[in-house]
């Protein structure tokens, strides 16, 4: 079931890729993908290219994929291990969701962080109290690690 579904998603992704994202298997392993997300132009991540790994569980799509950033990113919902705090990757997952939708959700998280459900409280605090400093730091990290 899982590998058939993953094959179908790969076909759909190749046919109709989401804006500013690409993804596909690493080598022959259909359960391990790498994705590339372009930093949204209306965010401090503009111009950055962010690598993301995707691991599908054997019971996909009934369980969410494990998705993590490999590129360092300064963001209240992404920690230094690359873990992403995103409801659809946890309790709001639904088998109706696809990798394409997950990648789009991550893109919009880059544009609109959720400081009320942070993975990194210090960055969330900066986002809420000193937006200018947050954006400058995020821009600096993007230039340093994602370009």
From Swiss-Prot:
Active site location: 85 (glycyl thioester intermediate)
Transferase found in the keyword field: yes
Keyword terms of this UniProt record: ATP-binding, Nucleotide-binding, Transferase, Ubl conjugation pathway
SUPFAM superfamilies cross-referenced by the UniProt entry: UBC-like
Gene Ontology BP annotations: protein polyubiquitination; protein ubiquitination; ubiquitin-dependent protein catabolic process
Stated role: E2 conjugating enzyme that associates with the E3 ubiquitin-protein ligase EL5 to mediate ubiquitination of target proteins.
EC number(s) stated in the UniProt entry for this protein: 2.3.2.23
Classification via SMART domains: UBCc (SM00212)
Originating species: Oryza sativa subsp. japonica
Protein name as it appears in the record: Ubiquitin-conjugating enzyme E2 5A
GO terms, molecular function: ATP binding; ubiquitin conjugating enzyme activity; ubiquitin-protein transferase activity
Region of interest (Disordered), residue spans: 1-24
PANTHER family cross-referenced by the UniProt entry: UBIQUITIN-CONJUGATING ENZYME E2
Pathway the protein acts in: Protein modification; protein ubiquitination
Comp. bias regions, Basic and acidic residues: 1-15
Gene (name only): UBC5A
